[in-house]
Amino acid sequence: MVLNIEQKPGRLIISYINTEGKVSYLQLNVPSSHQFSYVYCKQKSRAHPGLKSWDGKDVARVPAQFLNKHRLQEFFIDAGEEHTKQLFDRNMPDLYACDIEVDVTDEGFAEPEDAKNRINSIAWVRHPDCYVFGLKPLSGEECDQIEKKINDHVKKSGKEYKFIYKQYKNEADMLYDFLYNYARHAPLITGWFFWGYDWDYIYNRCTKRLNMDISFMSPTSQWYEHTIKIKGKKRKIMLPYHKLIVDYLAIYKKWDRTVDVKENDTLDFVSNAALGISKIKYPGTFQELFNKDYDIHVFYNAVDAILIELLDEKLKTMNTFLGLGNITRVEAMSAFSPIQMLEATLTRYAYKRNQIFPKNFERKEREHFEGAFVYEPIPNLYEWVAAFDFASLYPTIMRQWMISIENFIVKDKLFVANNNQIKTSSGAVFDASYEPLIPEILSNYYGQRKKAKRISQEADMEFAELKKIKKERLNTTI
């Protein structure tokens, strides 16, 4: 699984997850003969032999310092499986859950962009270890009590945690130790509303308020902007190259299918619904929690991070996010964009047909497209009601009617289609004389899905049989 592809003149630095769940790196040289992009070509004499654009037009190569998104996919194919296979093995990264607690003043919570209030503690969890980094002292007895409370609280999970507390003289020392000696080595860091608050707060607190250089969070000291949406408004946050920092709330909202009734997206509600375990309740204010009941403050912080890890094991939503990026062979964060995954997949399948997607310099205005038809229900009391749920309905329609981009002919309800053409009810006409790109891709993925379902069913049957054997042996022993 690829984390990031960082381009330097003449080479690629690629980070990926290895078989141990850690980050490894591959450097690939890009010879000058491969440093180009394709463009549409009107002069036959300049056209590249043997290649056409996806829509059947001539193309030419033009020099380029860096490979664009289509050329990257083509370059990996040209490099060969022997050089790139390890990049796309189905390896999952070690996950670390994180949660911060910030000083709350009479003005309330500080905004992450300003990060004007001190970070009081940081929880850091990967079973069996639960670290809390804090600013106040705790006795050995208090730490033992916190560990007991943690394990009592999450007893339903069947897990036990070892609690480790580290105290610091000041916030800067705490943040540096946490980031340099712990977070820097983690392949995947996540938390609840982590982009919108915790991570953005840590970054801005360090760089704007404490004047700390935390470029070391990236092995190459390179960072990039990532755009998030909060309440309909876009905001940019900074993320380090070659490390996955992911908001579990974001992937939960996008991909979770386990929690049926989503009344709200708070950690307390979701953990209760999925695990039957709630956050820690405290009757006072956050100020009182830190000032008067510091041991409960630390307990509260620790449980929040533990709940993230337990949710991931229960929901497995992170696997969906990471798996999508891997099977479509894009950088992990690109899995948030269906368009980027589709473009990468189309590029690979087209390239094997000697078709490419040229760089198009035309700028078009944004267009609106008609969505799927939804029948307007008529409110009433009915004696018979039926609900139909078709397996893979849209992919099946696209495969059946040969719907793709490169074989589209015209949209005209009066058009008379011949034997090698397919006309849909909307009047869209497609060339059916060959298997087009999108139906080929869908058939391939559909076949993989059926195979995966069969393997899953066989595993479930084997598990049930083993449970039965175990029960019979226990009864025999008794």
Spans of features found by a protein language model:
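Common nucleic-acid-contacting/processivity interface regions adjacent to the catalytic cores
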Residues: 285-402, 464, 470-478
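Helical catalytic core of nucleic-acid polymerases
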Residues: 384, 390-478
